[in-house]
Amino acid sequence: MSGSPVKRQRMESALDQLKQFTTVVADTGDFNAIDEYKPQDATTNPSLILAAAQMPAYQELVEEALAYGKRLGGSQEEQVTNAVDKLFVLFGAEILKKIPGRVSTEVDARLSFDRDAMVARARRLIELYKEAGVSKDRVLIKLASTWEGIQAGKELEEQHGIHCNMTLLFSFAQAVACAEAGVTLISPFVGRILDWHVANTDQKSYEPLEDPGVKSVTKIYNYYKKFGYKTIVMGASFRNTGEIKALAGCDFLTISPQLLGELLKDTSKLVPMLSAKAAQASPLEKVHLDEKAFRWLHNEDRMAVEKLSDGIRKFAADAVKLERMLTERMFSTENGK
């Protein structure tokens, strides 16, 4: 019998091992899929909410959001906008019942180049959370990492005490600007960087440590730790568990339920690949970026320019689809409501 604890330890899942050196976050709007993985936090985005809003299990939330939009009145457009904001918050509030940490809720990607509009929309979302009995300490507002988005994040953090998660982050320039803005958390993307390299270069597969997305997040993590930035680095957008394992030790990693499931079944040994101590030895030098320098440095990275604009377009398109779906249900005469 004495050998059993050792055996049990050896059979520990990769997910449980990962949790020893990284905060695990669930990347989904489908909160019924969260329970078995016991994540600390959760992240949502317009695409994930759109997918969840079409599932039968969540129709009560959709109905509640529609009723809220109608109750507030105004033009058709205003009613739909209010219903969308309410829907995002309803999903977030339900997710928070299942996790001990924070949920990330995204500001409409169509506002990505309008600093003031992003600030106003973020404050509105926090107000809706407050009405739902959720403190702003449990919410991260997601903003696209454009120059305007990063400055909106700085303003929200400094003037309103609202925590921000800077998303669609593909370039080192974006990461430096976010660090200087003092935002709570960044979401550098991994899988979408890999996608770009597979589509635009001759190399079609990569070992995890050579994966360009993994290398990007590793560089950003090392830079933040070497120069003492408090901003949390949360790797996001994974295509396989190899990428996740190659970033073990990163502050946070946000992972889809499908890949969380694969990690739960995986019993191979996991070792931390990133550490604040090792980061001190990295050869990176400190950089300061004003707006002009940021725009130039970001523009020099073709992959990042293309993936940021592509990401904004995709999230905006899904926001339009969600609005269309809610508009049909709110105002179609066939609905009978």
From Swiss-Prot:
User: Keyword annotations for this protein?
Assistant: Acetylation, Cytoplasm, Nucleus, Pentose shunt, Phosphoprotein, Schiff base, Transferase
**Single biological process term from Gene Ontology:** carbohydrate metabolic process
Task: Give the domain of life.
Answer: Eukaryota
* Active site annotation, chain numbering: 142
Q: Which Gene3D superfamilies match?
A: Aldolase class I
Q: Which GO terms describe its cellular component?
A: cytoplasm; nucleus
- Phosphoserine modifications at: 237, 256
Q: What GO MF terms are annotated? A: identical protein binding; transaldolase activity
**UniProt subunit comment:** Homodimer. Interacts with KPNA1 and KPNA4.
Share the domain note from the entry. The first 10 amino acids are essential for nuclear localization.
Membership in a protein family: Belongs to the transaldolase family. Type 1 subfamily.
Q: PANTHER family per the record?
A: TRANSALDOLASE (PTHR10683:SF18)
In Swiss-Prot or TrEMBL terms, this protein is called Transaldolase
Organism, by scientific name, is: Sus scrofa
Q: Which gene encodes it?
A: TALDO1
